[in-house]
Amino acid sequence: MFITLQKYTNPTKQYSFDTLFNNELVFKENATKQYTIETNIPKKIPNHLFFCMQQLENLTKQHPELGLLTTEDVDKEYTTVRIPKKQKGKYRTLNIPSDKLKNIQYDVVKTLQSFGTLTHNSAFAYVKGRSIYNALEVHQQNNSKWFLKIDLKDFFGSCTKNFIYKQLKQIYPYCILTQKEGCDKIIKDIIKIACYKGKLPQGNPISPYLTNLIMVPIDYKLNQLTPVYTRYSDDMLFSARTKIDLNKTINNIEAIFKGTPLKINSEKTRLGSINGNNWNLGLMLNKDNNITLGHEKKRKFKATIDQFLYNPDKYSIHEIQKLSGLTSYYMNIEPKYISYIINKYNKKHNKNLLELLHKPYSFNF
């Protein structure tokens, strides 16, 4: 059983509880002290469980249809759309819930968040205050020299109803709530309305939160394989100061995944060093251990703004918004270099990139 409740720790210290509820594993990161069930915890846990039970009951009162919708009813509330990827001819499939179902899902997320369960420290996607850049900073702080990037195959689609339920039963407070008949039914109803055709879809508001939640036990185990491990959704990055044993690490990962639907996408597995190409979540660490965009991204960005400044009128509002977001993101990574490039091409075309990106546009659709 895993416990990651911030509210039951001293804010100046982090605790790990090695024995709680029949000596099952209870996890809290960056441990400095240990307690047993006989000491500090039992008075607080029941109060928190009662609070969680009340929150679930309030959710069913707010949305009585939660327990009435069948799997078929839920599936009918989705619309499937395909978004073109960067690779020509490839698409990302999104399953978008109706406004009615989406409202229920938003309230479900609020209810689950009120339980106070934290995501693992290694998870950086869909977590407020964490980003891809923050994930790479962890590897940078370790002065890592070797990197192993692993991609999970069909991550959201691998999260089936049974897998979600099985994972929740390992995490506090769900491990106890699922033992109580009324609460167990509500949790199963929540899983039901979170899924489309029996799996977590990309495109609804509950999937990102649930994936991080159910990955807590797995992230905990993966975190022990190499000195540094981070996960950004389906992208896992392992690093060390010495060369990583590729076969051994992959075998260990597959052993952790055994009995789960999770699979490694072997086509995207990459091992690299700081002296060569490293592909760390789209960013890189150079020889000086600085986070950089990498040569290829810089080359494409220069070509893009050069073309845009040459004839900005031919760009659609969607393309302008996309370029604006990309520029802001790149500025956060390498502000000095990106500012230099922008000024260079501003002078070349006698225009102002940032003004053009942020000026109000009107289009006829």
Place the predicted regions along the sequence by residue:
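Short acidic donor-binding/metal-coordinating loop in glycosyltransferase active sites
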Residues: 152, 233-234
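Short beta-strand->loop micro-motif that forms the acidic, two-metal-ion catalytic signature
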Residues: 234-241
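Short beta-strand
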Residues: 228-232
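Right-hand nucleic-acid polymerase module
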Residues: 1-85, 93-150, 155-204, 209, ...
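Conserved recognition-core residues within compact binding domains
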Residues: 89
